[in-house]
């Protein structure tokens, strides 16, 4: 199928698209902001028009689509444990008016924690957007080591996590609970009660394309299970594990919030943990 798409694209070009058609805020954020940030971090080291890229935790593939359409990427293979990317042709049609997605994109579903390097090697660049906080803690090192083996010498890896667990909305539950740091002060039962009782519309930018699959109540259960499974890594721990996996840190940015810390949390956690909302890393393979 891939060769047929490439032949069609060679004859007809990439399907026309129009960003003025975008109506979905989740799509807009990942098509614009996420893709621009990934391009900024990868594009300083790689020519995306020539690079072979792998996206670990690609989700619905919207950011990959934008990297092709807006930033000239020509080869991105997305990997995920779910099949949200299967919706991308429909999403691209609805949000951009595209008749088909670019042949530069390919996707694959994997079993959690399964090794990749045996069949995926020689990549120029890797990216991972808000994925590693969901990886089982004792699997972070072997997965990073496996991704290191997927990368060619001199290749780079853009890794981002937001929000980090100890930050104000590190629970990933903000669509239902807007109280900063509530997850560090309340019991799981109290948190679940808050979510379960939530009524009314959600922030459109927080509603992904999987919401309809679960329904309102099912989605509440899904995101709460995701919260319970968070590995609670700090930025320092992530960097230390990345180095253990063989990476060197080429660039690092930590973004912090400026807001009062609740008295109940003062002294319980380092202030930097509580304020550090996001970590962005460019890792290199020597």
Where in this protein do the model-derived segments appear?
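A short glycine-rich, Lys/Arg-flanked "PGG" loop and its adjoining helix->strand segment in the class I
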Residues: 141-153
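Class I SAM-dependent methyltransferase Rossmann-like catalytic core
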Residues: 6-46
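Core SAM-dependent methyltransferase catalytic element
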Residues: 245-247, 266-286
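Conserved class I S-adenosyl-L-methionine
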Residues: 50-59, 158-203
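A short acidic, Gly/Pro-enriched loop at the edge of an enzyme's catalytic core
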Residues: 115-126
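Short alpha-helix
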Residues: 229-246, 252
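Class I SAM-dependent methyltransferase SAM/SAH-binding core
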Residues: 61-115
């Amino acid at each position: 199928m891939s060769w047929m798409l490439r032949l069609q694209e060679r004859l007809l070009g990439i399907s026309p698209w129009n960003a003025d058609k975008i109506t979905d805020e989740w799509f807009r954020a990942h098509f614009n902001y996420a893709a621009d940030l990934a391009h900024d971090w990868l594009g300083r080291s790689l020519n995306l028009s020539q690079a072979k890229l792998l996206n670990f935790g690609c989700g619905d593939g919207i950011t990959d689509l934008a990297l092709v359409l807006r930033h000239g990427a020509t080869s991105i293979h997305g990997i995920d444990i779910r099949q949200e990317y299967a919706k991308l042709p429909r999403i691209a049609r609805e949000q951009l008016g595209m008749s088909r997605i670019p042949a530069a994109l390919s996707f694959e579903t994997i079993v959690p924690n399964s090794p990749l390097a045996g069949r995926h090697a020689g990549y120029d660049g890797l990216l991972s957007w808000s994925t590693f906080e969901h990886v089982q803690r004792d699997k972070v090192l072997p997965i990073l080591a496996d991704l290191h083996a997927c990368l060619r010498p001199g290749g780079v890896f853009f890794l981002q996590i937001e929000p980090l667990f100890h930050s104000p909305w590190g629970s990933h539950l903000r669509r239902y609970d807007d109280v900063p740091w509530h997850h560090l002060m309340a019991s799981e039962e109290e948190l679940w009660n808050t979510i379960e009782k939530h009524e009314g519309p959600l922030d459109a930018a927080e509603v992904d394309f999987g919401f309809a699959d679960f329904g309102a109540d099912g989605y509440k259960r899904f995101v709460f299970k995701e919260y319970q499974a968070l590995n609670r890594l700090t930025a320092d721990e992530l960097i230390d594990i990345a180095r253990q996996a063989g990476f060197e840190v080429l660039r690092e940015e930590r973004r912090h919030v400026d807001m009062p810390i609740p008295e109940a949390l003062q002294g319980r956690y380092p202030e930097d943990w509580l304020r550090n909302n996001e970590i962005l890393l460019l890792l290199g393979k020597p």
